[in-house]
Regions:
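C-terminal, non-catalytic tails of nucleotide-sugar-dependent glycosyltransferases
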Residues: 10-53, 168, 178, 190-217, ...
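Short, acidic, metal-binding catalytic loop of nucleotide-sugar glycosyltransferases
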Residues: 74-84
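Glycine-rich, basic loop-to-helix element that forms the pyrophosphate-binding segment
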Residues: 118-135, 153
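Conserved donor NDP-sugar-binding/catalytic core segment of glycosyltransferases
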Residues: 147-193
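A short, conserved alpha-helix in the catalytic core of glycosyltransferases
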Residues: 1, 22, 154-158, 212-237, ...
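A conserved acidic beta->alpha catalytic loop
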Residues: 91-102, 120, 148
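Short aromatic/hydrophobic "clamp" motif used to bind/position activated sugar donors
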Residues: 140
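Cell-envelope/extracellular polymer assembly enzymes that use nucleotide-activated donors
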Residues: 54-59, 86, 251
Length: 329
């Protein structure tokens, strides 16, 4: 006689009971949500009903790279099913005349776009803070100019999380052009200060314990695509301008954590990120000095947290490899 335990599909009744249990939980809590089974037996997807149609301010810093920016804007326009948004493109230190020619066409083509100009030197934190102060939305969606929207409901998937009272930020699943993973959450201490877990894993993989296909909390997510409540952004005083290039989004998420706000990753908001896999190499003395300075600043500010280890990552797993393999003793 064969055991039904060997075949998960034979226990459909148990999974249906699990679905009903989740639905009953939401009903008791007064949360309007739909629950559906996933392809993984015993794993469920909950979709919380969005309240109203709040204005989303999408903030995109830009320097030249008009082809990247146009692809980003056109994908937002053509694919997004959530339409109550504005886009703030923040021009900063562009050098090419064609960039400014494009801006004129851009504002005529996309009625939802506003062009802002940052007149000082590059500082990712300061640029985004500047735009946030001029934004009209109840939520800020920080977005890189080199991304392309893949899933039409990308905004809703993050918004349904951010509308929950205890959630401060939501991040998306980002892919390299070859469909490998670029971002699926950030682990503190991975590779030194912090790193993207599952980076370069197959885009079709489920990941360790299904982490690539599950909504879950992380210590941080990348600001290449991150949705934040305006009130929570103000609560932590935005991005810290001392982090000019590196660690600004990690620091921001850690500050949210200090205020008992959750940072959540969703695999259901998906975008391409056309960042070269070799990008970010500190290949000049100036860049190396700046990176070292920001590394020391992060270590000074978050030394206790680094020493404790990431609360969302097992101490038995490697912090030198990003694949959740076992840590070497």
């Amino acid at each position: 006689m064969e055991s039904t335990a060997a075949d998960p599909a034979s226990k459909v009744y148990a999974y249906e009971a699990g679905k009903r249990a989740l639905e009953a939980h939401y009903k008791r809590m007064g949360i309007q949500a739909e629950v559906e089974m996933t392809k993984r037996p015993g794993w469920y997807r909950s979709q919380v009903k969005i309240k109203g149609q709040p204005l989303i301010s999408i903030i995109i810093p830009n320097k030249d790279h008009v082809k990247d920016l146009e692809l980003c804007l056109s994908s937002i326009d053509k694919k997004s099913t959530y339409r109550n948004f504005e886009v703030l493109v923040v021009e900063n230190n562009s050098n090419h005349p064609e960039t400014f020619e494009y801006y004129e066409k851009m504002t005529r083509k996309y009625s939802f776009v506003r062009l802002l100009t940052w007149k000082e030197g590059f500082n990712f934190s300061a640029i985004n803070n500047f735009a946030a102060a001029l934004a009209n939305g109840e939520y800020f969606l920080f977005l890189n100019n080199d991304v392309e929207v893949l899933t039409p409901n990308w905004i809703q998937e993050m918004l349904m999380l951010c509308q929950q009272k205890d959630v401060g930020a939501a991040g998306a699943k980002l892919f390299y052009p070859d469909d490998t993973i670029q971002h699926a959450g950030v682990v503190i201490g991975l590779g030194g200060i912090a790193g993207h877990i599952f980076c370069r894993a197959s885009g079709s993989a489920d990941g360790y314990m299904g982490r690539l296909v599950s909504v879950q909390e992380y210590s941080a997510v990348t600001a290449a695509c991150m949705l934040v409540k305006k009130e929570d952004f103000l609560l932590v005083d935005g991005f810290d301008p001392e982090f000019v290039v590196a660690f600004n989004d990690i620091d921001f998420c850690m500050k949210l954590g200090q205020h008992k706000k959750k940072v959540v990753f969703t695999p259901y908001a998906q975008l391409y990120h056309y960042e070269s896999k070799s990008r970010g190499m500190e290949d000049t003395p100036e860049k190396q000095l700046r990176f070292k300075k920001e590394t020391l600043l992060f270590e000074k500010k978050w030394g206790k947290e680094l020493a404790k280890g990431d609360p969302y990552y097992s101490p038995n797993l490697s912090v030198t490899e990003g694949d959740c393999s076992l840590r070497e003793v």
